[in-house]
Amino acid sequence: MIDLSTMKQQIETLLNQAIERLKTKGVLKPEVTPVIKITHTTDPQHGDFATNLALTLSKAAGMSPHALAEKIVEALPPSGQITEVEIAGPGFINFFVTEGSYQTVVSSILKAGKDYGRSEMGKGQRVHMEYVSANPTGPLHVGHGRGAAYGACVANLLNAAGFEVHREYYVNDAGRQMGILALSVWVRYLQGYEASIELPKNAYQGEYIIDIAEALKAKYGKQFYHSVESIQAKIPEEIDSNADPEAYLDVWVTAQKDLLGPKDFECVFQAALDSILNDIKNDLEEFGVTYDDWFPESRLVREGLIQEGLDLLTKHGYVYEKNGAQWFRATALGDEKDRVLIRKNGLPTYFAADVAYHLHKFNQGYDQIIDIFGADHHGYIPRIRGFLKGLGKAPEKLHILLVQFAILYRGNEKVSMSTRGGTFVTLRELRHEVGNDAARFFYIMRKPDQHLDFDLELAKSQSNENPVYYIQYAHARICSVFRQLKTTQKNWDRPRGMENLSLLSTNYEKELLATLGRYPEVIKRAAMNYAPHLLAHYLQTLANQFHTYYNAERFLIEDDNLRNARLNLINAVQQIIRNGLTLLGVSAPEEM
């Protein structure tokens, strides 16, 4: 059994042995430590693998790269898997492997099935992943969808590479935005009784707020009703809603709490939170994005985690008091300015909550911690690394991945996505329009830090230009071949096909075999680099090669040996497409 990663390891071993021989001969000094990089060639005429080792060591050897390449090739031990080694260009070394090496890939794939490509590279290391974590103040919009698809794919890839992944959603159920949400629902509730009351312009405006308010009214009647006069009595006249709309909102929230009292305010607050959070959970689950835990911010206070973080920073000398507030000495750890932890009113800041939450993550003993943020959080990275140092934790365990928001276009018109304004396109609306598969694939087919203009028309099209359709169509085409087989008198003998894989000699077949052999390496690279787009691009290449093969050759032929070999080959292609799409959260339909 063989895969591309094994071949690369074998070639690396051969090169290391050659280098040691050259050291013994005095061509290279004993202290020379080579960094061997082996790549898969893009042109079969240049072999299957290549290395630039001679170019990187030529200075140390005191000779031209080409001359050193000749000596390296001369020093290579023989290998039964290598048929030819050639020197190309200024000193690249190209390796040609035996056809049998690639043909065994088919048997490996068909034997392993859905587990082909999985590895123990991660050795069971525990990884904590947090992604999406959108405030539960409204439905998820199309921007959140990219973080959801990306995070879910990275988690799947790490799991396939042998890591134990814990998926978590941090629920911001405390803080100012949640107070504004409760206020927005309450005002809409009051409008059911008092048409004259106006919703503050910076409150949440969406139709979903009205839906929550109507449900509240249906269940509780006038329990939360207060007259316009009683509310206005709580609003100081000097507060101008137009001059300072945010301060005006805060006064409204305070008035709501005073009038309702703790019990009724909590009832309104919880109704709003539960409604939106349940909607988010359902939306993500329908999108194929699931979590092991939904961690509420309120738990940080309830379990004393904020105080624990504050105590630890204080112990290490990074907390001081100024103007009645407690500050984190962030500038001592590389940040641009110090940060408030506890306000003078005694309430913790968002920053204090982040300190506590990350302390909690580190206390769980994970080997890696991954935060996936929107690109607008770029400036937050040095703050997090700073307070981790202040807590005495190892910042190198934390990996912060930034995802650019996707921009949705209808024709040439860019769609606004303002949550408070209520004029946004939800993730659910996008999914219903283009389908889960297109949404999942389009979100991850580019690097996460690249801007993504989501082309709605392309995502819906059934054409070769639509990458997810093109890949799924390859899978469906293979399924159709096997359905057609059942209508003929011909059979499919797998063992006989394995015995005759050497008959797969066309360029189309050689290309497919080589690409199939790369799959395990692609999974490892995509996992280690948190790069699901690498898998997406690989599947596009594989699908393109299959479609070319399908259009050029026939499969249900009279020659039993060649027919069985070809059916085994396309069955392996079918399996890899299905495996890869599954990791990306995309279905592999049997008919299209």
Curated annotation (Swiss-Prot):
Concerning SMART domains, the annotation shows: Arg_tRNA_synt_N, DALR_1
- Broad class of enzyme this protein falls into: ligase
Q: Where is this motif: 'HIGH' region?
A: 134-144
What is this enzyme's catalytic activity, as reactions?
tRNA(Arg) + L-arginine + ATP = L-arginyl-tRNA(Arg) + AMP + diphosphate
**CDD domains, sorted:** Anticodon_Ia_Arg (cd07956), ArgRS_core (cd00671)
Q: What is its EC number?
A: 6.1.1.19
Q: Where is the protein found, in the record's own terms?
A: Cytoplasm
Annotated GO biological process? arginyl-tRNA aminoacylation
Print the keywords alphabetically: Aminoacyl-tRNA synthetase, ATP-binding, Cytoplasm, Ligase, Nucleotide-binding, Protein biosynthesis
What the entry lists under NCBIfam families is as follows:
argS
The text of the family note is: Belongs to the class-I aminoacyl-tRNA synthetase family.
What is the designated name of this protein? Arginine--tRNA ligase
Organism encoding this protein? Coxiella burnetii (strain RSA 493 / Nine Mile phase I)
